[in-house]
Amino acid sequence: MSQKWGLVHIYASYNNTILHVTDVTGAETIAKVSGGMIVRNQRDESSPYAAMQAAFKIAELMRDKGIDQVHVKVRAAGGQKSKNPGPGAQAAIRALSRAGIKIGRIEDATPIPHDGTTPKRKNR
């Protein structure tokens, strides 16, 4: 049986967690699920529970398309915002592996500024 690879982009901020599955080139979207699609309350969108449920849902959609192995790209807000991924990133990766999806590489794709715009000043 041939193994089909996919690419899971996990955008984890402190407001939401978005999981987006593409083919290996990143050109064709296969499935997309966010924490806001899972929970009812807006405050729970970024929670590890919402990320876990989104990962289980996306694993099911991937299996329907025949993808059983993935590489993972984790991304935080970055730029002038937080460079640390939100609480849902680790939970989503753990849930993907629990759902039976084999994980290849895990890569950080957070954008880092190379001296672009001036950050907001701190309050005194």
UniProtKB/Swiss-Prot annotation:
Q: Which GO terms describe its biological process?
A: translation
A GO cellular component term found in this entry reads: ribonucleoprotein complex
Q: Which Gene3D superfamilies match?
A: Ribosomal protein S11
Q: Which InterPro entries match?
A: Ribosomal_uS11 (IPR001971), Ribosomal_uS11_archaeal (IPR019961), Ribosomal_uS11_CS (IPR018102), Ribosomal_uS11_sf (IPR036967)
- Which region ranges are annotated with the description Disordered? 104-124
Q: Which keywords has UniProt assigned to this entry?
A: Ribonucleoprotein, Ribosomal protein, RNA-binding, rRNA-binding
Q: Which residues form the signal peptide?
A: none
Identify the domain of life: Archaea
Q: Name one GO molecular function term.
A: structural constituent of ribosome
According to its UniProt entry, the function of this protein is described as: Located on the platform of the 30S subunit.
Kindly give the PANTHER family that the UniProt entry links to this protein.
40S RIBOSOMAL PROTEIN S14/30S RIBOSOMAL PROTEIN S11
State the similarity comment: Belongs to the universal ribosomal protein uS11 family.
Q: How does it assemble?
A: Part of the 30S ribosomal subunit.
Name under which the protein is recorded: Small ribosomal subunit protein uS11
Organism expressing this protein natively: Methanococcus vannielii (strain ATCC 35089 / DSM 1224 / JCM 13029 / OCM 148 / SB)
Which gene name does the record give? rps11
